[in-house]
Design a protein with these regions (language model features):
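An N-terminally biased module of ancient metal coordination in phosphate/nucleic-acid-related enzymes
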Residues: 1-78, 149-162, 166
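Short amphipathic alpha-helices and their capping/turn segments at secondary-structure boundaries
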Residues: 19-28, 79-93, 125-139, 164-167
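Domain-core and long-helix interface of multi-subunit machines
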Residues: 11-13, 97-167
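Active-site gating/metal-coordination segments in enzymes
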Residues: 11, 61-69, 73-120
Length: 167
């Protein structure tokens, strides 16, 4: 069975999906789910990417099965590493994705991250990701490596191995 292993519900600031709707959609597609609510301490802006893991498990544990698992997506930042690790250790998560959503403390969604040329910005992104995933040794999965490509203002947004394999 295939699984969608990166899915947010109402416990994430960027989703309003109910677990019931997620399960119904998964059944229609004949796939399993791993819910991965956002945990991104000290995220800039108005949205709070934090949730109560005890409440999460209290509400959702009865749905756990061979086709539904409960996880978390941790936003990686060096200064929140210890806090994030304690959070992950506070509950029996089935899966832990660690992702890079910020670069030098700035949200990759905004053009203010892209003041340098593409190679410089992407190299900083990749080097930061490598450094942080090594520190976040509690991760099972490194999330969306190409996240920067969604929002970068460059004509050619893709990360190409040929451009970075020597650096």
């Amino acid at each position: 069975m295939l699984f969608d292993t990166h899915l947010h519900t109402k416990f994430s600031a960027d989703s309003k999906m109910s677990i019931e709707d997620a399960i119904l959609s998964a059944k229609q597609q004949n796939i399993g789910l791993v819910l991965t609510e956002h945990l991104d301490y000290d995220f800039p802006g108005d949205d709070i990417y934090e949730f109560n893991p005890q409440q999460y498990f209290q509400e959702y544990s009865s749905y756990q099965s061979k086709t539904l698992y409960l996880g978390v997506e941790v936003g990686m930042q060096e200064h929140t590493l210890i806090q994030s690790k304690k959070f992950v250790e506070s509950a029996p998560f089935d899966q832990v994705i660690c992702s890079l959503h910020l670069l030098d403390g700035k949200d990759l969604f905004y053009e203010s991250c892209y003041t340098e040329n593409k190679h410089t910005v992407y190299l900083n992104y990749l080097n930061t990701m490598i450094k942080l995933i090594k520190q976040h040794d509690f991760a099972n999965i490194l999330g969306h490596v190409d996240y920067i490509c969604r929002y970068a203002p460059y004509a050619k947004k893709d990360i190409c191995y040929e451009e970075f394999h020597d650096t």
